[in-house]
Amino acid sequence: MKSNYSATNIKILKGLDAVKKRPGMYIGSTDSKGLHHMLWEILANSVDEVLAGYATNITVTLDLNNTITVSDDGRGIPYEIHQDSNISTIDTVFTFLHAGGKFDDQSYKLAGGLHGVGASVVNALSDHLEVTVKRNGQIYQSVYQAGGKIIQKAKKIGDTTSHGTTVSFHADPKVFKKAQFDSNIIKSRLKELSFLFAKLKLTFTDQKTNKTTVFFSTSGLVQFLDEINNTVETLGQKTLIKGEKDGIEVEVVFQFNQSDQETILSFANSIKTFEGGSHENGFCLAISDVINSYCRKYNLLKEKDKNFQLSEIRQGLNAIIKVNLPEKNIAFEGQTKSKLFSKEVKNVVYELVQQHYFQFLERNNNDAKLIIDKLLNARKIKEQIKQQRELKKSLSSPQKEKILFGKLAPCQTKKTSEKELFIVEGDSAGGTAKMGRDRIFQAILPLRGKVLNVEKINNKKEAITNEEILTLIFCIGTGILTNFNIKDLKYGKIIIMTDADNDGAHIQILLLTFFYRYMQPLIELGHVYLALPPLYKLETKDRKTVKYLWSDLELESVKLKLNNFTLQRYKGLGEMNADQLWDTTMNPTTRKLVQVKLDDLINAEKQINIFMGEKSDLRKHWIEANINFSVEN
């Protein structure tokens, strides 16, 4: 059947309709990440007032119904009738795409909200939004509903001696479904901003918990790096480099450490560039060139030795890169601004870092020796891993099958996106899972031996020769560390399914530590999940009602509604029969899965070091600060 294609098929989306039709083009997604991006857009406008030198306080409030409010003490959005829209400037900013104060080269010399769509996009994707502006001794207010429809045009509602802008919005549940603001994600971002702008006061109030947190830093990026380095053993001193060229301001602080994990955070005009870009490229290239030049000058690399690759140098490097660029120079890839694409900044960052870091190493020979000795040792380990990879390649199919024999129960489908790998604790639960699964798309891998704590080993060779770890590597297929290739992934979902007890939780942490250290992109790309088996089975005496419960809170709620029932507490997966395990934990339509996310890299690194590392004093401190040992009768 052919369809007609004519002029009537061409649609012109007016006003904010384009945003409502394709929200992902403007905020990246309509899940939790997209919801928080809405907040970042409004927050960026307040931060632009800080960049311009007019604001010193920002407050964020999350109320009980998921409405969020951002307030600053900047200049306030102008109220006057706009010459092009013929409505107030406040309403223009919130109802017209590409309307803002960042285009005239005068109001903001530096700004992060450059596309002029942030405020209007948030309005388009909210079912309610209010703007209150304090400016020139007067208070103005606008109210919008249903995706930007003006309910109350901007009007004067009072007088004031203060100044600033307050925006409150409630995201449209039709767009964001069940997504909720996460106070931990918000606090993490505000904490970053306090480090980026020393002496800026940021206050967050979560009305759900009735807690207020204040973020304030006196030493900026140096304090930020100290926070990142809190749980690692550092090598030498911190290096702080500041400079300016052609109107581009650069501030970089970095330090090497004994681990092999890198944390490189970059910001452009206060916008966090998750995917890096030209400023990161300039920094990394400069560090690489300086270290290799230093090694050649002092014969620390033999003539036959190859230069250190950037991937080698970045291991154990923690760095924060902050650049401020004039509006004419700055360009981001995409509306979500996750990657900086300004060509000029790469050269400026490179020149400043290259010049100052070489001088730093010349003045601090002991620091240079510590760093380069570590790089040489890491190169030896890399060679060992390469040999192990060659061993893997050399294994014939029968040999690989021998390693997996009696362990992996494969599935039938060949489509990676549909395949699920359940990593199960022990043969007992593994046997039940094999019987209860859907063989078409679900594979089962029981773990028989103890999972290695990779955080406590000194040599990576110990990890890649451990039988359980080697089995995981073969099953998943991507390789590890620098040899990781997501294209070789064999399963769309990797699901850790353990007992709902302390031992099960410990196995989860051991496996997550391995994935985080050796296969981090699996987590970053959303392939790792935790299965949630129920804690209780409740059945009425007449056997007409059977309920599975996942928490004590659910249990107490059900007890109020039902009488005459029997209750079974599951101590392990093996206590369920195959049908029960399928219904509660494996069936995609009824199960509960938790996707493991890496929203806060710094906090993840810190938690891994605390719980799985060698420093018992860190664990003791965490327990004392977070666990209440009081007993209630």
UniProtKB/Swiss-Prot annotation:
Source species taxonomy: Bacteria, Bacillati, Mycoplasmatota, Mycoplasmoidales, Mycoplasmoidaceae
Name of the top EC class for this enzyme: isomerase
Similarity field: Belongs to the type II topoisomerase family. ParE type 2 subfamily.
EC number: 5.6.2.2
Cofactor binding comment, as recorded: Binds two Mg(2+) per subunit. The magnesium ions form salt bridges with both the protein and the DNA. Can also accept other divalent metal cations, such as Mn(2+) or Ca(2+).
Function: Topoisomerase IV is essential for chromosome segregation. It relaxes supercoiled DNA. Performs the decatenation events required during the replication of a circular DNA molecule.
Coiled-coil features, chain-numbered ranges: none
Binding site for Mg(2+) 2: 499, 501
Catalytic activity: ATP-dependent breakage, passage and rejoining of double-stranded DNA
One Gene Ontology biological process: DNA topological change
Protein name from the UniProt record: DNA topoisomerase 4 subunit B
Quaternary assembly: Heterotetramer composed of ParC and ParE.
Cofactor or coenzyme needed: Mg(2+); Mn(2+); Ca(2+)
A Pfam family of this chain: DNA_gyraseB
Disulfide bonds listed in the record: none
Highest taxon in the source lineage: Bacteria
Swiss-Prot/TrEMBL site (Interaction with DNA) positions: 450, 453, 506, 619
Gene that encodes the chain: parE
UniProt keyword annotations, A-Z: ATP-binding, DNA-binding, Isomerase, Magnesium, Metal-binding, Nucleotide-binding, Topoisomerase
Domain Toprim: 419-534
Gene3D superfamilies registered for this protein in UniProt: 3.30.230.10, 3.40.50.670, Histidine kinase-like ATPase, C-terminal domain
